[in-house]
């Protein structure tokens, strides 16, 4: 969890069009297991 937050501080809080950016989406899902 802490490692995840270090890499993606906003992980789990992505919303709207920002979440649709493929790199952000895939990084969030791969690193944190969070679905955008």
Swiss-Prot record:
GO biological process, one term: killing of cells of another organism
Subcellular location: Secreted; Nematocyst
GO molecular-function terms, A-Z: potassium channel regulator activity; toxin activity
Cellular component, GO annotation: extracellular region; nematocyst
Main location: secreted
Position of the signal peptide: none
Ranges of residues in domain ShKT: 4-36
The UniProt record lists the keyword Transmembrane: no
InterPro entries: ShKT_dom
Disulfide pairings: 4-36, 11-28, 19-32
Domain of life of the organism encoding this protein: Eukaryota
Keywords for this protein: Cytolysis, Disulfide bond, Hemolysis, Ion channel impairing toxin, Nematocyst, Neurotoxin, Potassium channel impairing toxin, Secreted, Toxin, Voltage-gated potassium channel impairing toxin
Function: Has hemolytic activity. Inhibits voltage-gated potassium channels (Kv1/KCNA).
Family designation: Belongs to the sea anemone type 1 potassium channel toxin family. Type 1b subfamily.
UniProt-recorded name of the protein: U-metritoxin-Msn1a
Lineage: Eukaryota, Metazoa, Cnidaria, Anthozoa, Hexacorallia
């Amino acid at each position: 969890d802490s490692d995840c937050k270090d890499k993606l501080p906003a992980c789990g809080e992505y919303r709207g069009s920002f979440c649709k950016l493929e790199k952000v989406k895939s990084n969030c899902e791969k690193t944190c297991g969070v679905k955008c």
